[in-house]
Design a protein with these regions (language model features):
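Bacterial N-terminal signal peptides that target proteins for export
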Residues: 1-8
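Bacterial N-terminal signal peptides
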Residues: 9-16
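Sec/Tat signal peptide C-region and signal peptidase I cleavage site
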Residues: 17-23
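Short A/G/S/P-biased low-complexity tracts
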Residues: 23, 338-341
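Sequence/structural signature of beta-propeller domains
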Residues: 24-316
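A short, hydrophobic C-terminal helix/tail in secreted or cell-surface proteins
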Residues: 319-339
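Short, charged juxtamembrane terminal tails flanking transmembrane helices
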Residues: 342-346
Length: 346
């Protein structure tokens, strides 16, 4: 959602605030605003996803997606325009090559409609993939661990959370009852929650919630300021030394920002939640008896979608929802999740 005035974080249920014990992440521009504008006619960045040999992003109220190379250059239009994407924020994700989904095909949906579109990885073809969801699409992720059948997970602005299989058939997992934009899966046990559990960041509830495979939901942390995306820091982040590793996020309404892998190594296994209201970058961790939250920001600009990229997603065709680093058969393929923006700037 587009937001301008910071909303103060008030209370955290089941959690406590703490002063960061490490240096805050340092962000720098990865894809410039002018290069995006030259390709698609605007640079109010919203979605951004890693797709194996490229990144694919979206712009607010813009029908055309764009792609970049792995260095943030070579910005070009991706696929053909989709009229439905004119309705506001468009969320972008990439499939993992499991559960019947192809490796790193691109999927996108807009906040104005309950439809998801599929694009071939090279952008040469595209089609409507799933439709009829209640509420506009706010987030798309792929279950890398299997607790949710390796299906696509979609969140909508009505708070509905859907499982969507590889044929595009959707079934309701649960509803949190409010706008939800961030999705991610825990790469290991997180507090009392099992490895592979789905976590969602809800703007409407100002909370981080956990959702079991059976659809039971519980609040993990509340009182967050306009939580936008949630992503677990990959367990092997920075292990390869490859410069592509790191954290990437859309900085509305300007560009794409990146923080190097080393900046997030102190937070491996933690949940990172960005706040849309005032540049917050929340670190949420389990201290053995309770969840503890620290603000390790600021993020430059208004945070939109974001992703962690690690060696496993660079070298192997199996990444994860907006994060792409999970631990599957000894392979790290965690995942992050992010989200989209709202209709009228507020």
């Amino acid at each position: 959602m587009r937001f301008h005035l910071p909303v103060p974080a008030v209370a955290l249920s089941l959690a406590a605030w703490a002063v960061p014990a490490h240096a805050n992440p340092t962000f720098s521009t990865f894809v410039t605003g002018p290069s995006i504008a030259a390709a698609v006619g605007g640079n109010s960045t919203i979605g951004f996803a890693y797709a194996g040999n490229k990144f694919v992003g979206s712009v607010y109220f813009n029908t055309q997606l764009y792609s970049t190379n792995l260095s943030g250059g070579g910005v070009a239009a991706f696929g053909a325009p989709v009229a439905a994407f004119a309705g506001g924020e468009t969320y972008v994700s990439s499939s993992l090559g499991i559960g019947g989904f192809g490796p790193r095909d691109v999927y996108a949906g807009n906040q104005s409609l309950g439809n998801v579109y599929r694009f071939a990885n090279d952008g040469s073809s595209q089609s409507l993939f799933a439709s009829g969801l209640s509420g506009g699409v706010r987030s798309i992720a792929f279950d890398p661990y299997g607790l949710y059948g390796n299906n696509m997970i979609v969140a909508t602005n009505t708070g509905n959370i859907y499982k969507v299989d590889s044929s595009g058939v959707a079934s309701l997992l649960t509803s949190v009852g409010a706008d939800t934009e961030g999705l991610s899966f825990a790469p290991q046990a997180f507090g009392t929650y099992a490895a592979g559990t789905l976590f969602v960041a809800s703007e409407g509830l100002s909370s981080l919630l956990a959702i079991t495979p059976g659809g039971l939901k519980s609040t993990v942390v509340s009182g967050l300021s306009v939580p936008e995306m949630v992503s677990f820091v990959p367990l092997n982040l920075g292990s390869s030394g490859n410069p592509v590793e790191g954290f990437y996020a859309a900085s509305y309404p300007n560009n794409i920002q990146k923080a190097g892998a080393s900046d997030f190594v102190p937070y491996i296994g933690h949940a990172i939640v960005t706040g849309e209201g005032g540049g917050q970058v929340y670190d949420i961790r389990w201290n053995g008896s309770a969840f503890v939250t620290s603000d390790i920001g600021p993020f430059p600009g208004q945070a939109e979608d974001g992703i962690f990229v690690t060696a496993d997603i660079i070298q192997n065709p199996v990444p994860e929802p907006e994060t792409y680093a999970l631990m599957m058969a000894g392979l790290g393929v965690l995942g992050f999740i992010a989200r989209r923006k709202r209709q009228t700037p507020r």
